[in-house]
């Protein structure tokens, strides 16, 4: 773990958020995600959780402005409290995907979010993002593929346990890529990130 990321985790004074973030890092390829995020953008992270990625993005580039959007009030309060000394990251307990709220946003992150919303809502969400981003704006998606089967079922069981057996809506990376391109995005980077148990894919798309 690099020193900046370790310092970001150590900002969390409470044991549960800190353990949660360490467990997330064992699964989520945070540094690979951060590597494809523009260093001079105004970034909106939809469903930011405790805000670890956003704090890391803010600390690794002072030219980024990072905005975290999260509906879990407890997580937002913790993220706000531990990031008070950082001028380039803010957290809000609301859905910011609205024209009045996302002015000057030129990069939007969807990190392990899509499979938690229905297929219809996924389509609506992606269409909304396309309409809100300026030409040349960037959408970054990190989610989980439904192949190979053993990784899919492993993650399905994991997410069911974590969410209290909420319904989940996984799509193949190929299908999600086609959905993005159908809206008018151009895929500029795509990778499948190696993990023994999780079928991560990372997609960078630009509005043309």
Describe each model-derived feature in a short phrase:
Residues 123-135:
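A short glycine-rich, Lys/Arg-flanked "PGG" loop and its adjoining helix->strand segment in the class I
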Residues 142-183, 189-194:
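C-terminal alpha-helical "lid/dimerization" subdomain adjacent to the S-adenosyl-L-methionine
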Residues 23-39:
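Conserved alpha-helix/loop element of class I SAM-dependent methyltransferases that forms part
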Residues 7-27:
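Class I SAM-dependent methyltransferase Rossmann-like catalytic core
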């Amino acid at each position: 773990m690099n020193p900046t990321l370790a310092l970001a985790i150590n900002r969390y004074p409470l044991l549960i958020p800190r353990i949660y973030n360490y467990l997330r890092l064992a699964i989520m390829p945070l540094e690979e995600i951060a590597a494809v995020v523009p260093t001079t953008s105004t970034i909106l992270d939809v469903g930011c959780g405790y805000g670890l990625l956003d704090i890391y993005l803010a600390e690794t580039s002072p030219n980024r402005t990072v905005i975290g959007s999260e509906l879990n009030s407890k997580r937002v309060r913790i993220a706000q409290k531990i990031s008070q000394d950082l001028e380039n990251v803010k957290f809000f307990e609301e859905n910011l995907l609205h024209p009045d709220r996302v002015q000057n946003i030129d990069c939007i992150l969807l990190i392990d979010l899509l499979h938690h919303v229905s297929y219809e809502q996924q389509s609506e969400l992606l269409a909304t993002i396309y309409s809100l981003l300026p030409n040349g704006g960037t959408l970054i998606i990190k989610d989980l593929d439904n192949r190979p089967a053993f990784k899919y079922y492993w993650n399905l069981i994991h997410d069911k346990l974590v969410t209290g057996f909420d319904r989940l809506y996984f799509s193949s990376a190929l299908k999600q890529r086609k959905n993005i391109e159908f809206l008018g995005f151009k895929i500029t980077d795509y990778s499948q990130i190696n993990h023994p148990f999780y079928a991560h894919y990372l997609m960078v798309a630009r509005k043309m």
